[in-house]
Curated annotation (Swiss-Prot):
HAMAP family: Ribosomal_uS8_B. GO terms for biological process: translation. GO terms for cellular component: ribonucleoprotein complex; ribosome. SUPFAM superfamilies: Ribosomal protein S8 (SSF56047). GO terms for molecular function: rRNA binding; structural constituent of ribosome. Gene3D superfamilies: 3.30.1370.30, 3.30.1490.10. Keywords: Ribonucleoprotein, Ribosomal protein, RNA-binding, rRNA-binding. The lineage of its organism: Bacteria, Pseudomonadati, Pseudomonadota, Gammaproteobacteria, Pasteurellales. Belongs to the universal ribosomal protein uS8 family. This is Small ribosomal subunit protein uS8. One of the primary rRNA binding proteins, it binds directly to 16S rRNA central domain where it helps coordinate assembly of the platform of the 30S subunit.
Amino acid sequence: MSMQDPIADMLTRIRNGQAANKVAISMPSSKLKVAIASVLAEEGYVESFKIVEGSKPELEITLKYFQNKPVVESIQRVSRPGLRIYKRKDELPKVMGGLGIAVVSTSKGVMTDRAARQAGLGGEIICYVA
């Protein structure tokens, strides 16, 4: 059976990996997953990521911990294949009053809610991370 929502699967792997205190997790790679991993790395929620080439490219994410506690407290899918959620620049949400981030897919690429607001862009809200 094919996977219905690969992004939700990615977020679940991150959540489960940190719950099990894994050093790194791997998953099938895609352009959107790499873009999301890049935003998470920029914002300091994951240590790093790399693409392992092969017959099927794999995305390997190195998870980040602070004092043996996961840096990612919660990671939640917002827009999903059955119900896409789009917001204009002035409607972009602040996650935990600005302490968390919303990952937004815009016409200029995947970025945080802060970067999208600064660029004056709206888009699809992929997930919330806190």
